[in-house]
């Protein structure tokens, strides 16, 4: 069988996640993370053949040095993998309205990613660096780089979901609307849910909850996204690790006018100092909140606000299911591991027919998925996400 090996790159502002995946069978040959870019402690960790390795990249290193290390040090240990690479898949956070599906990267696609920088100012510039460096390091794959957009899956939303009640000219002239994020994850777990529920995708009605340091909920009706909680940017919606999610917009004016905060300070407050971090005053880590829920007021406060918001979104999205909700899906680092978040949130949704099975819920953690509700309940299911596999499969499909 011909090789379907794909290098998957996910470039953040200060990190680079990478993997080599066989798109045909999902086997992961190498996976790793380069982090702490532009700092003295810049380093890279990777796993190959079951063995974990780590190395310093050198003070001030960033994407360029990391990719150079991947090619000339890591892949040099297994030259046959390099030789079998058929494509490179790039995760792109924001594709604006233009990209409704993955695309082979050319000058026009690069321009489209550049045009979406205002909506993802930290992520899209990093993705462009990753694309440029990949083209440099893998000249033989120049026509085989594929962009996979987090926003693409949400482009099926109807106008009533994506428009804000602002002057319509802001949408017409400046593309200000809801875009959503985590689309690749919502797509993957909804397709896995269809298999588990033995339903055709185009007849599947589910609400998917991707809960990690960032979090979003999507309403998926007949296999297509009809609403999602993140908005123009990934700040809207759920309580997150350091992001506020939904607030009264007038709080921004109050912080500026009454408290004398600058726009930059307010931006930092809402994106980096709020969420679980803001509510606990200690940490953005959900594990701390879960572990200390019964003993510490800060943890109880944070957990209760988090689950209240999540349950509200699930409840409101059930109204979009046209009378039939097949299941609620949990995924992402918190969704897959925080049994307490799932139990407390679903407890608020008894009206929708959810009843958690305590033992099943505890069992569905640390890489184990499955149904977490009782046999008579409407199903809630934990499905570990695999965005890298979707990126690899899209890259292989488009470059075949």
From Swiss-Prot:
Active site: 150 (proton donor/acceptor)
Note on how the cofactor is bound: Mg(2+). Can also accept Mn(2+).
Essential cofactor(s): Mg(2+); Mn(2+)
PANTHER family named in the record: ACETATE KINASE (PTHR21060:SF21)
Positions that bind Mg(2+): 10, 387
GO biological process, one term: acetyl-CoA biosynthetic process
Gene3D superfamilies cross-referenced by the UniProt entry: 3.30.420.40
Name of the molecule in the record: Acetate kinase
Site residues (Transition state stabilizer), renumbered to this chain: 182, 243
Enzyme class, broadest EC rank: transferase
Family matches, as InterPro entries: Ac/propionate_kinase, Aliphatic_acid_kin_short-chain, Aliphatic_acid_kinase_CS, ATPase_NBD
Reaction(s) catalysed by this chain's protein: acetate + ATP = acetyl phosphate + ADP
Organism: Sodalis glossinidius (strain morsitans)
Source taxon at top rank: Bacteria
Classification via CDD domains: ASKHA_NBD_AcK_PK
């Amino acid at each position: 069988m011909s090789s379907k090996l794909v290098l998957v790159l996910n470039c953040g502002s200060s990190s680079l996640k990478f993997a080599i995946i066989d798109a045909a069978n999902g086997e992961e040959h190498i996976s790793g993370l380069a982090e702490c870019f532009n700092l003295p402690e810049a380093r890279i960790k990777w796993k190959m053949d079951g063995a974990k390795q780590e190395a310093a990249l050198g003070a001030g290193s960033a994407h360029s040095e990391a990719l150079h290390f991947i090619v000339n040090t890591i892949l040099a240990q297994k030259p046959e993998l390099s030789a079998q690479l058929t494509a490179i898949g790039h995760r792109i956070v924001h594709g604006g309205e233009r990209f409704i599906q993955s695309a082979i990267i050319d000058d026009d696609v690069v321009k489209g990613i550049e045009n979406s920088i205002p909506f993802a100012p930290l992520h899209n510039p990093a993705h462009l660096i990753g694309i440029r460096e990949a083209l440099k390091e893998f000249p033989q794959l120049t026509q085989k780089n594929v962009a996979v957009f987090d926003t693409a899956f949400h482009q099926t939303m109807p106008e009533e979901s994506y428009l804000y009640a602002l002057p319509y000219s802001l949408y017409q002239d400046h593309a200000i609307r809801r875009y959503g994020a985590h689309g690749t994850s919502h797509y993957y777990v909804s397709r896995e849910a269809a298999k588990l529920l033995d339903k055709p995708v185009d007849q599947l009605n589910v609400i998917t909850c991707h809960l990690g340091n960032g979090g979003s909920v999507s309403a998926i009706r007949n296999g297509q996204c009809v609403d999602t909680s993140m908005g123009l940017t990934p700040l809207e919606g759920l309580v997150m690790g350091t992001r506020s999610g939904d607030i009264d917009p007038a709080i921004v004016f109050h912080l500026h006018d009454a408290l004398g905060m600058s726009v930059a300070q307010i931006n930092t407050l809402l994106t980096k100092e709020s969420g679980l971090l803001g509510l606990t005053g200690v940490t953005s880590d959900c594990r701390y909140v879960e572990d200390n829920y019964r003993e510490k007021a800060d943890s109880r406060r944070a957990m209760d606000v988090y689950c209240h918001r999540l349950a509200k979104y699930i409840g409101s999205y059930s109204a979009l299911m046209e009378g039939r909700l097949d299941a609620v899906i949990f995924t992402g680092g918190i969704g897959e591991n925080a049994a307490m978040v799932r139990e407390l949130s679903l407890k608020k949704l008894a009206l929708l027919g959810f009843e958690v099975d305590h033992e099943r819920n505890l069992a569905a953690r640390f890489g184990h998925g499955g149904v977490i509700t009782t046999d008579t309940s409407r199903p809630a299911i934990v499905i570990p996400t695999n965005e890298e596999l979707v990126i690899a499969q899209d890259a292989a499909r488009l470059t075949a």
